[in-house]
Amino acid sequence: MGQMVEFEKNGVKVRGYIATPKWAGPAVLVFHEWWGLESPLSNIKEICDKLADEGFVAFAPDFYKGQYADNPDDAGKLMTEMFEKRMDEVDRIFQASVEFVKECRYTYPKKVGITGFCCGGTLAMYFAAKFPEMVDASLPFYGLPQLTQINAENIKVPIFFILAEKDEFVNNDEVIDIAKTVWKNGVDVQVKVFSGVTHAFLNEKREDVYDPKRACEAWELAVNFFKTYLK
């Protein structure tokens, strides 16, 4: 089990959840869904714990700074405010988080992967494009590219897009177009569309959409991806 922590880097205050492995390992930043890190509907802390069990230092920054939602209306408001008004602050939180995990005594080698779910998947695309020098691999789960500008031509690191066939929020064709742009630049790109499932199918706290079989398959792919490019 991990724990909530707070720290300050270069004047940027960050709070988040960290889980560490038994021995040293590379780091993975995990970006929360529109619910927020502390929401009872979020499984991001559990994702961090599972990554630690696989040998990674996992840190989930709280981009909502303690706020969270337990219903779609409030979640939408928090997410929209973040993408429309707070992206400069979100950038600084990300940069501080990278520094934090690289300085962690459990992090070795000093490599950093990023992943996220829902709007966190959007951020996993966005940061890979905006800060390619700070990222070693990216794995967005059903990210929504329409939420912010994704400069796909700037993505220089291996990236794996995991999508849901029946996702009512994500236009999978738009994500695949991003993947094609990255591939044309000679970057290692993978895309997996899981059939018969919808948005958030990995979230065991959402019984209405959770698919244990597909979730297990997707998780195995994710772990193998990070072990390939970070270790």
Swiss-Prot record:
Gene3D superfamilies reported for this sequence:
alpha/beta hydrolase (3.40.50.1820)
* Top-rank taxon, per record: Bacteria
Tell me the active site: C118, D167, H199
Q: Name one GO molecular function term.
A: carboxymethylenebutenolidase activity
Which InterPro entries does the UniProt entry name for this protein? AB_hydrolase_fold, Dienelactn_hydro, Dienelactone_hydrolase-like
> What UniProt keywords are attached to this protein's entry?
Hydrolase
Q: Which residues form a coiled coil?
A: none
EC number of the protein: 3.1.1.45
Catalytic activity entry:
2-(5-oxo-2,5-dihydrofuran-2-ylidene)acetate + H2O = 4-oxohex-2-enedioate + H(+)
Entries under PANTHER family matching the protein: ALPHA_BETA-HYDROLASES SUPERFAMILY PROTEIN, CARBOXYMETHYLENEBUTENOLIDASE-RELATED
Family membership noted in the UniProt record: Belongs to the dienelactone hydrolase family.
State what protein this is by name.
Answer: Putative carboxymethylenebutenolidase
| Native organism | Aquifex aeolicus (strain VF5)
